[in-house]
């Protein structure tokens, strides 16, 4: 299928369409050839279609540009809320179908699935059921389809696994589905099948099983009205016709045959795809109502369901299904899974009225919507057309009758509708008829769609797996088991273990437990036979934002850095499931936007250089950045001398430009590329106008558009100059050609693109301060750059073929415009000194000027005049002395390019920076640092190539004048590697370059015979020389003969008009090419002239030797042309036209040449300056003449009309590498005697050339030189007034370089003429590739160069440009991927110029012999050995995480390093704990045996957290004692020891005693009287009291 231009996508200009043509066609269609169908069932179906198309859909953006071959719509997050006002995500696809593009504009069908959608798998009954809140992806789409040249159609597609669904176009309905089981290729298309709806193979037209009868339809309505009155008596109906949205909550059931056919894992996706299509059909405006089909529940019958019988008999199946679906439908419409209609999908071949297969596709109750026992239908699965069947049967549920039966909607012209009884497969799209609209509107207006008014509610289910008891309460479970009259037995307890139901007053049970989720009490439900409490969560607290933090430091000192401020969600923090704060968390602004110095390193380069001091794989490198377009805000760096790159940072520092070069101001912030406007505001839409003025209106801009029309040229030709400051540069060819665009600077020797005859790759090239995008699609080239350029550049064209035209344009600011900004309001002012540039040694502090606004402060630098910005200041700063460090020099070249002994060295010194110098120190001063390596192995993984062997040189092909010698060159294969082709010796060489002797300067003529026209001539190829002069000759003959010159002219030379007749065919000169109008006239003055007739000349090569005539002025090797005449051959005195086809040349077009005979009129002819057309000489022989006469190759100019048919007087001439010879035209004279005349040459003198009557005016603006042509002195002349060609004329012709082959030239004079230069043949190019030279012999005709000094000497040499000397450059092999058991290693292969080592495009190497060097090779094939391990050592620590070690070694060094056993293992990871003891308490008694107590705890050791104390175990050490004895001595009996008074106050001691603190030893000691010792007897206490009483009395 052709790739058509999508001009209908947007209002693109022709230029923009050309630029984007390649992108729009990318990934357009599958490759030609048959498509395999791995799935047999699909193959059988497709092969049965009369017509189908294989397409390759691609995902595109809104503009139609290619994005991906991946078609899946990637919404992986949890399903969003589907409110009607929510935002929608759009997705776009493009398909090339029937030579036109289809552009799909789709969005997720938000209302297609209910928010409480449930997928349920049933295994026979309710006790074996699995319910899940399905996680079906949001891949079901709906929208529009746009076809080129037509209006918009509708589409409903599912992008879950490819594109499946249907779309409507004005000329028909189409289905699309992917080729199943087709292998998915990364980066490749997935083939899809598109077929028309009417092309679905069916033996007969399928029908609907609903019977068409007036009586039946009337009875259905009466039954419905009766049911409405009986079941809904209190509902008042509004008789107004109000259009409002309706939601049809739908249950879809798939039987076991559906699951078996589509597979358990695919059936859900297939059904949802079908229902998505059904939704699209009900959204067709022809239905006249807003109806939404919403799937709330999908039931997959994994096993045959009890109570549901699906048979061939459609009515019985429908009756069984309706009864069954009512039993499982929750009664309350508020239940999230309550359905309004049930749809059964089956693979059973159903038939209306019979229990056998037939053509019935579906059956439904008429007007059954919202009736629980009749709102149901059955549908036979027939593939994607199933969607139309379901829509048809749902229409019956809305009371829609068949079209054409008892109504006026009979399909006109067999144009069907959705509600046609027989689903005829007509190409036009299916819609709802006017009758269908009236039926459904009447149904809804009567209030029969009352159940469709509620919007599907979202149910608060938290778990993905839903317990059945949540949906079915205990009463419903009993009804499912024992019928609709059963209820739950309230008297029975422990419902979670056994469900008891009341049936006819008796409690019965099947000893089954109630379903999980059944309510078993307040805030409790059944789970796994147990009643579990459902906890209530506290009220949630939503979060609130706190205050903004101050602005951070600027990330850069110049070039637009970034500052940030952030706020936290802590006012208050969200708790108990409360929503987190929404809105802006962190804000950014740009700072220090003034540009950095041009010589300063880029910001990315500075970040890469930070890793110069960080060892990478134990080596230090100097890193520089590389750009990854796919991840512009990640930092990738590459060593300067390395061939690998590494991602150093996941996110560059804020303020790093996203793209280096160009005019993009976008910067990376927090790892994301942010758009920055020209006003340096983040996410700003401020842009520059066409000439760079921020927020400008373009009034200061001018766009220059030019066209380069030069058709022909050689080498590099200037197209035009792009001035400095140019923007929006576009250069493009009008049509594809074989030419190449090039760019060079104003320096002629400096090329930026495609210079030196080297064609570069497509891509972006940084030059002149901007980036030029060079793109070549086929032969069409274009250049684009945003600008501005910082220097003027020349656009050139490297000519290869005719230029069809090149147009280019650019935008530049007008000259002489004043700046509207008031300059006096803004001025430059120096800022603060920066910190020292170094942390040690001597550095620099800088001070820069900032743009200041008067009365405001520092503003952006763009407000100040950059021309007046003062230079920055700097001064030295001295810091502490720098410490010693290692300095490593550059690596020397490797000692070997291959083999096992390669090494490279470098110098490593210990140095210290002292001011501006480096001082070398002893190595011991740096011994604390890691010393870089001084010796490194290299090229050891590269096998050395085999050696070339050469043979002896052959003899030279010629002895002089330039020849070739050859020799054999073979590869010895003395190594495993092949020979290096880049070092292959030459097998050919030039030889015999010495000049040939003068006696052989004239070559021997070719041999030839003349035939009488029976055999066509075989033309000898004549190589076209680089310089193609014109040469004019006339036949020469013996001196005694009166000669005449045959005329070669345009047809009808006697008329002066531009029209003529060629053998009965009309011709007309083209006035649009004036360069074709000039002619040459060569004639003699004889009155009796032999004429070349149209039937007389034929040329036939022969192997006979030809010698020159004794009577003619010829010599060996001379070239003579003859004219003969004989009896029986007619002749004419009128000039005869000889049309000639020019030699093929794409550069110039030469003039027409005429040679007239007879006494014709004098004709002037304008001189033609063009010398590019070739003139070929031929050699002929006249039969019937004893003296063999040689002929000369005659130079011929192109005819007036370049393409003459075979019916013309003369056949066309060969154009490519062939001599220009007319065929099968014998030439004779009246006398039969050959006439030989001298050579005629053209001299650019001031003498005039006669002009014929049919002269074509010469181009305007040119003054032609008139050439006076004379015959040589040795020729007989007549008394004609026409001039003759002189010897001087012939010399002039040779001098001007018009002679094609001087060696074939026979000197016309007898030695009395003037001297002239004679040139030899051009040699072959001196080289087989690259720049070389052609050589030829140049000598004076007198053999004395001084005689020809007055004449300009022709060039003896000229340059020749052949293809570049291309060769394959191979990089170093990488390390082997495995060290044993077979790995691989890779290397880089590049096509390079073997002379200057520049990279070439790969096609330059396609002519090299042999295949390219391999990119990869196997390595280390030896089998891996087993690792040897030693026993584990003891743990290094007894607690707190120790390490065990063991020896792991490989005996032979050939073990798999990826499977190396661990040599270390953690051990004793428990916490280190110890027993901690407190201080001993006081002894419980002062005598008589007491005890002391202290605290003993197991606590973590030092360094562990105190909260880890619960995890401590101290069993490994004995527990310290917690008690000990004290004061074991016996108490003394002395009365002095008796306590008679408390040491503290009596009242305080009584208080302590009341608080029961007497047991405390310190309290007992201070209050000894109030708290006596326990061992004091009663008598002692009495005696103590008496003593105390006495003391008081005293």
Swiss-Prot record:
Positions of the UniProt region annotated as Disordered: 1002-1076, 1095-1174, 1249-1283
Start-end of Low complexity biased regions: 1040-1057, 1117-1132
Biased composition (Basic and acidic residues): 1151-1163
Domain notes: The spacer domain and the TSP type-1 domains are important for a tight interaction with the extracellular matrix.
Listed name of the protein: A disintegrin and metalloproteinase with thrombospondin motifs 12
Feature: compositional bias, Pro residues: 1018-1027
Binding annotation for Zn(2+): 208, 392, 396, 402
Positions of the TSP type-1 domain: 542-597, 823-883, 887-943, 944-997, 1313-1366, 1368-1422, 1423-1471, 1472-1532
Gene from which this protein is expressed: ADAMTS12
Record note on pH: Optimum pH is between 7.5 and 9.5 with COMP for substrate.
Tissues showing expression: Expressed in skeletal muscle and fat.
Subunit structure, as described in the record: Interacts with COMP.
Domain Disintegrin: start-end pairs: 465-544
Keyword Protease: yes
